[in-house]
Structure formats: structure tokens, C-alpha cells
A protein has these predicted regions:
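Helical element adjacent to the flavin cofactor pocket in flavoenzyme catalytic cores
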Residues: 154-204, 208-212
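Extreme N-terminal leader/targeting segments of oxidoreductases
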Residues: 1-15, 34
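C-terminal catalytic lobe of FAD-dependent flavoproteins
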Residues: 309-402
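Short hydrophobic core segments
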Residues: 17-19, 208-220, 361
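Helix-loop-beta segment of a Rossmann-like dinucleotide-binding subdomain
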Residues: 95-108, 120, 127-178, 283-287, ...
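Dinucleotide-binding Rossmann-like beta1-alpha1 core, especially the glycine-rich loop
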Residues: 57-138, 142, 305
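N-terminal Rossmann-like FAD-binding beta1-loop-alpha1 element of flavoenzymes
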Residues: 14-40
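Active-site substrate-recognition segment that forms the wall
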Residues: 30-34, 42-44, 56-57, 95-98, ...
Length: 402
């Protein structure tokens, strides 16, 4: 049985118990504590999760996809909050989170990609978003390392970046300074009493009581034992492999902004950090819980990145990682109360977890203090997914620790 080895079996109480200590769980806990709520977080390794793999693009405009326009308003609202959010978090934690207002350049490498990018530009304009169409020559003038074959691109000055690892570390520190209590253990099962969520039982046997419970366990959110079937979040893991390279001083500046493209139908992006790190990603694989870094995944990312920026083959490869994105059926998050009183969800953010961190924290804090979601978050309430019929004999799940 997995446990931290330092918990007791006595019941401990709080106003809010957050299950999951990734960036979504941490921002929820931080905001709740700022509102005066006694808050606790359960996670064996708080600050970990998908943020340790993510690139940190804040791409409300360039992440717009057909069929996902519902998500646009939430993405734009969160992106607009990022400058103030970053400043507040850095002041609260004393740590730099690597927020850079550097912009993004999305480019096309052939005529088909160019036509697709033109369609995306038209969709952005119809949606009231700011983006500028550039010729291939104009793209290379902005980023000289781009391949000569670039046929055109979209310049989006409002899509920025943040370092997710620094973001997670800063949120952890801010939570600790705000008085959030951490239980570094696995949750064995949800606690339910008198028809409402009442806390959790940890792997070490500790019973945690809480007036409200927030399930923010990322891709594991649907695996928590004790969840009634009608409130199990429809969240699945989507594997993503990511590479990190280092730009030696002799090659700097390699890129000045995030560069992204679609190569042979696969999305690839290159995110330059101020410290010389270059993040290349990401695969999108329906592989269940597998987090193996594969030769094929590394090859595909380097091959596509090389077509975009040929000079990348000269850079040292310093890290290969794979993580799991928590995806919902419509690729949008689940935010808000469930059919089980006292249980709320903050999960299913898929590829937008870093971008949606500010608005998620604000929305969950408002829910926890007033009982109501703000208008911007209401379209993402869990009730939009009707639960599947279940036999009466299997009304409570028996699953793995979350």
C-alpha cells in the first residue's frame, strides 16, 4: 500500500479538501485559502503531474480548433488574466514563473498546410481574435532559423508562454505560505456520509473530514474509489511525448517566440525559454496509462521539428519525457458541482491546463465561497455529460487510489 508513512489514523478536518496536487489542484487550494477557507491538499507528490511535461504555451488564439469554439471564451478570459496572475503569484511565492509575452508564429510548410492555416485565420477573424497573415519571407524575417520552404504563417502577438515547472513550484510555495495543509499520500477512497461528500480516506488509514471536496486528480480523476457512478468524471488519459534541448550560447538567439506548425497532419511546436531551453512537442496518443518514451515518438518529433527549423539537429538533446493529459469527451474541462452534494470537479483540461490555471482558480474559489460558478465557467459544469445507466448493484465504484 502506497503511503507517506507519516500520517495518523485520527480524523482531521478542513473546509475544503482538494484531491490532487497538480497545478489545477494547487491553484484551487491557493485561491480557497486566500478566501479564508481552511484548505487541505492530498497528493503523494504535490507540484507534479502533467505540468512537469507540458510546454506552457498560453495559446488562446492559435489553439482554436473547429468544433471547440465553446472553449474559446474560457481560454481568452484566462489568457487575459495571466499578466496580473503571474505578478500576484510571483509576489506571493517569491519565485519567477517564466511568464514571457513573446508571441507565437504558426507557419505552413506546403500548400495544403497553407490552405488550412488560411482557414484557421478566417475562423480567428470571425471569432474576433487578433492574428496577422504573413508571407513566407516575412516569417523568415521574424525567425531567420525557419526552413526556406515556409509558405506563410500567422503572427499572434497575444499568445504567450509560461514555464509550467516553475508555475507548479510557485503555486506549491504560495499554498504553503497561505496556510494550506498538505497530506503527501494517496487517497484510498472518497468519504461519503449522509448522502454527501465528507472527505477522504488515505492509503495510510488517515481519515480527512471536509465540508467540501474538490476532485482535481487529472487523468486519474475517474479512478477514485467510492465515487457513485453518476458522478464519475468522463476523463481519459492522452499520452504526450515531449523533448527538451539546450541552445548553446553560440547559437543564441535560436528562436525569439513560440513557433508551431502542422507537419503531415501532426502538430509540432518549439517553445524557447530565456534560460536557453527549447521545448519540442508533442505527440498525442491514445495509449491508456502508458508513459513510455518511445524511439518512434522521439523520431517523429525531431523529424517534424527539423522540417520546420533545420538547425535543430545541431542542438544537444537533454531530456525526453512522456505525460498524460486529462481529456474529456469534448476536450473541455469539467468545472463545478456534481450530483453528489459537497463534491466538485476541476479536471479534464486536456492540453489547456496551464492556460486555464488562472480562470480555474478564480471559478473554483467563487464556487467554494458562494455556491455558484461565475458565468464564464458555467458552460463547463459536469452536468453537461449525462451519466450512462448503471445496474443498482454497482452504484459505487471500486477502483485504484487517486
Amino acid at each position: 500500500m502506497r503511503s507517506s508513512g507519516n500520517t495518523s489514523v485520527s480524523a482531521q478536518g478542513s473546509d475544503v479538501l482538494v484531491i490532487g496536487g497538480g497545478i489545477i489542484g494547487l491553484v484551487t487550494a491557493w485561491r480557497a485559502a486566500q478566501h479564508g477557507l481552511r484548505t487541505a491538499v492530498v497528493d503523494p507528490e504535490p507540484g507534479g503531474g502533467a505540468a512537469q511535461v507540458a510546454a506552457g504555451m498560453l495559446a488562446a488564439v492559435t489553439e482554436l480548433h473547429y468544433g471547440e469554439q465553446m472553449l474559446l471564451g474560457l481560454n481568452v478570459a484566462s489568457a487575459a488574466r495571466y499578466p496580473a496572475f503571474a505578478a500576484e503569484l510571483e509576489a506571493a511565492s517569491g519565485q519567477d514563473i517564466g511568464f514571457r509575452a513573446c508571441g507565437t508564429l504558426a507557419v505552413a510548410l506546403d500548400s495544403d498546410d497553407r490552405a488550412h492555416l488560411r482557414e484557421l485565420h478566417a475562423l480567428q477573424q470571425r471569432s474576433g481574435l487578433e492574428s496577422e497573415w504573413l508571407t513566407g519571407r516575412e516569417c523568415r524575417r521574424l525567425e531567420p532559423m525557419l526552413a526556406p520552404g515556409v509558405r506563410g504563417g500567422l503572427r499572434v502577438d497575444g499568445d504567450h508562454q509560461v514555464d509550467p515547472r516553475r508555475l507548479a513550484a510557485a503555486l506549491l510555495t504560495a499554498c504553503e505560505r497561505a496556510g494550506v495543509v498538505f497530506h503527501r499520500d494517496w487517497v484510498e477512497r472518497l468519504g461519503v456520509a449522509r448522502g454527501r461528500a465528507a472527505g477522504a480516506v488515505l492509503a495510510a488509514g488517515t481519515v480527512l473530514a471536509a465540508d467540501q471536496v474538490v476532485l482535481a486528480a487529472g487523468s486519474r480523476s475517474g479512478r477514485l474509489a467510492g465515487l457513485p457512478d453518476e458522478v464519475v468524471p468522463p476523463v481519459r488519459p492522452v499520452k504526450g511525448q515531449v523533448l527538451r534541448l539546450t541552445v548553446p550560447a553560440a547559437y543564441a538567439p535560436f528562436l525569439t517566440r513560440t513557433v508551431r506548425a502542422v507537419v503531415r497532419g501532426s502538430h509540432v511546436y518549439l517553445v524557447p525559454r530565456e534560460n536557453g531551453e527549447l521545448v519540442v512537442g508533442a505527440t498525442s496518443e491514445e495509449m491508456g496509462w502508458d508513459t513510455t518514451v518511445t524511439a518512434g515518438g522521439v523520431y517523429e518529433l525531431l523529424r517534424d521539428a527539423h522540417e520546420l527549423v533545420p538547425g535543430i539537429t545541431e542542438l544537444p538533446l537533454t531530456e525526453t519525457r512522456a505525460g498524460l493529459r486529462p481529456a474529456s469527451p469534448d476536450n473541455a474541462p469539467l468545472l463545478g458541482p456534481t450530483a453528489l452534494p459537497g463534491l466538485h470537479l476541476a479536471t479534464g483540461h486536456h492540453r489547456n491546463g496551464v492556460l486555464l490555471t488562472p480562470v480555474t482558480g478564480d471559478a473554483m474559489a467563487e464556487l467554494l465561497t458562494t455556491g455558484e460558478l461565475p458565468a464564464v465557467a458555467r458552460p463547463f459544469a459536469p452536468g453537461r455529460f449525462a451519466p450512462a445507466p448503471v445496474p443498482p448493484s454497482s452504484s459505487v465504484r471500486q477502483e485504484q487510489p487517486a
